A protein has these predicted regions:
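Single conserved hydrophobic/aromatic residue that forms the stacking wall/gate
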Residues: 170-173, 177-180
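Structural signature for solvent-exposed beta-strand/loop edge elements and short helix-capping sites
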Residues: 1-172
């Protein structure tokens, strides 16, 4: 059905009734927009949905995802991941007990035991729920939220019910914006 996608595996079965492939051992899905590597994967041809268990890695243009159980819609590039799930967006790592992800809207959310690590700004934010908006470089963290900023040889801790991490892009004012 999709000539751009190639699936490889050491073992595979096709279930005609469900339009479903079940692959085991060294599963690889290659597509110009993403790459998936898994130990065990079910692929539904009509919906292009994948369900996987065991160590799985999904690589897109600007993200890497790792989990040990989850679902990924290859057509819409969105998914739900559990068990040791992580999303790596450039210099930011999102970890949590469960993660949702949508590449088209550049949005991710994390639930339970979440950790957002920003290696560029040397910041770690923890909590029990987070929403991450990659396109505007911001995040909202609630429920037991704490931010840790590493400053030279020290750390700054900030605790709140809800934390917002927002990157504001600075543009210099034009001469006509000057107030006299």
């Amino acid at each position: 059905k999709d000539s751009a996608t190639t699936i490889k595996s050491l073992e595979g079965k096709y279930f005609l009734e469900f339009s479903k492939y079940t692959f085991n051992k060294q599963v690889e899905i290659e597509n110009p927009e993403y790459y998936i590597q898994s130990d065990k994967l079910d692929y539904f041809t009509k919906t292009e949905h994948t369900f996987f268990s065991g160590p799985t890695k999904i690589v897109g243009e600007d993200y890497d995802i790792y989990c040990e159980k989850g679902f990924y819609d290859t057509r819409n590039k969105e998914g739900y991941f559990t068990r040791k799930s992580k999303i790596n967006y450039s210099n930011r790592l999102i970890e949590g007990d469960s993660l949702t992800f949508n590449d088209n809207s550049k949005f991710a959310s994390a639930s339970k035991n979440i950790i957002l690590t920003d290696t560029l700004n040397k910041t770690i934010i923890k909590g029990d729920y987070a929403e991450i908006f990659k396109a505007i470089d911001s995040a909202m963290i609630t429920k037991r939220s704490v931010a840790i900023k590493m400053i030279e040889k020290d750390s700054l801790f900030i605790k709140a019910d809800t934390l917002f991490a927002i990157c504001l892009l600075y543009t210099s004012p034009s001469p006509r914006d000057t107030v006299r």
